Amino acid sequence: MNAHVPPESVSAAEDSWTVAGRTFRSRLIVGTGKYKDYATNAAAAKAAGAEIVTVAVRRVNLTDPTQPLLIDYVKPTEFTYLPNTAGCFTGEDAVRTLRLAREAGGWDLVKLEVLSDPKTLYPDMEETLRSLKLLVSEGFQVMVYCSDDPVYARKLEEAGAVAIMPLGAPIGSGLGIQNRVNLRIIVENAGVPVLVDAGVGTASDAAIGMELGCDAILMNTAIAEAKDPIRMARAMKHAVIAGREAYLAGRMQKRLYADPSSPLGGLI
């Protein structure tokens, strides 16, 4: 049975997904960067219907009371915080950052990303895998940003990742999902949730990710850099729902030739 498809008896209203023992109804995760202010960020997260928000521990103010605090706007009582290691280019930096996050907020469900270079922000998969093993040994529940390589996705799951998060395209590029085949293979082989992480630019990109069978979509720039972030957040919410519904419904088979909607027999 495909772990990413609920039993047929489950209605759309009851459809949910679970990661590290925590169950969520919304399949849209949003970031907390690039917004003009925290108030806009909070409004967008609510418009998206998100239950999880990612937080770049090294960039977002969580503790300095002399500056605006994210927690005063995007409240931890309303959202599940997912600390991440954005901006880390070595495994050591990533592990250190998440240790600090756990000390500061008690978070053990975290997102690991170890970047290879500033130009592409592609994940360094060797460093990612090495860091994952260390974090798992320390009791972290790790969701992992990774390449769209099915082999590495399997290795990450075997090493203890609680979710696999392959990029759709480079972070912040808005190019949409570039390799649907690999993403589909990752989904079919995975025993943990698979989330598109990075590259979504507009609503159709989010819908495609869900149509491919992904459990959820994570995005930041697509909403934050839209001309109207709140409206785009709403659009993304509906796109994720539509894509999920289409995946569960099962699309028609593609055909080379036409197949009339109305029978041709018995015509006047």
Curated annotation (Swiss-Prot):
GO terms for biological process: thiamine diphosphate biosynthetic process. One of its GO terms (molecular function) is thiazole synthase activity. The active site is at K111 (schiff-base intermediate with dxp). 1-deoxy-D-xylulose 5-phosphate binds at G172, A198, G199, N220, T221. It comes from the Bacteria. Keywords: Cytoplasm, Schiff base, Thiamine biosynthesis, Transferase. It catalyses: [ThiS sulfur-carrier protein]-C-terminal-Gly-aminoethanethioate + 2-iminoacetate + 1-deoxy-D-xylulose 5-phosphate = [ThiS sulfur-carrier protein]-C-terminal Gly-Gly + 2-[(2R,5Z)-2-carboxy-4-methylthiazol-5(2H)-ylidene]ethyl phosphate + 2 H2O + H(+). Pathway: Cofactor biosynthesis; thiamine diphosphate biosynthesis. It is found in: Cytoplasm. It holds the Pfam family ThiG. One of its GO terms (cellular component) is cytoplasm. The keyword Cytoplasm applies. Disulfide bonds: none annotated. InterPro entries: Aldolase_TIM, Thiazole_synthase_ThiG, ThiG. PANTHER family: THIAZOLE SYNTHASE (PTHR34266:SF2). Homotetramer. Forms heterodimers with either ThiH or ThiS. Catalyzes the rearrangement of 1-deoxy-D-xylulose 5-phosphate (DXP) to produce the thiazole phosphate moiety of thiamine. Sulfur is provided by the thiocarboxylate moiety of the carrier protein ThiS. In vitro, sulfur can be provided by H(2)S. HAMAP family: ThiG (MF_00443). This is Thiazole synthase. It comes from Caulobacter sp. (strain K31). The gene is thiG.
